[in-house]
Amino acid sequence: AEKRLTETRATHAATGQGFHGYEIHIGRSDGPDRARPFAHVEGRPEGAESACGRVQGSYLHGMFRDDAFRAAWLGGFGVASEGGYDAGVETTLDALADHLEIHLDVAGLLVCAR
């Protein structure tokens, strides 16, 4: 089987929430849990969920960047989604920059870089 990378629009099977992601797929998946797909892509089942619902799998990546999907998925576990993805990334990067500024000799690094 050949590896493929595809941008994808999918619908989460349990919540009906649509989301965007990308698919990295090679080979074939099989087994009884495939009867319970994680999502649907263009009408075809994608991924799987265990009978107890505690294990879910998907070839789709990047789905949790979608704020609406993440909120719906977490809501299925009774957990609220806090904040948007992009804002969270910015906050994390700002905190990392502050940490580096405190613990690194930034001026010295800039001198070395010139």
Features from the language model and the residues they span:
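Pocket-forming structural segment of enzyme catalytic cores
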Residues: 1-49
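Acyltransferase
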Residues: 46-114
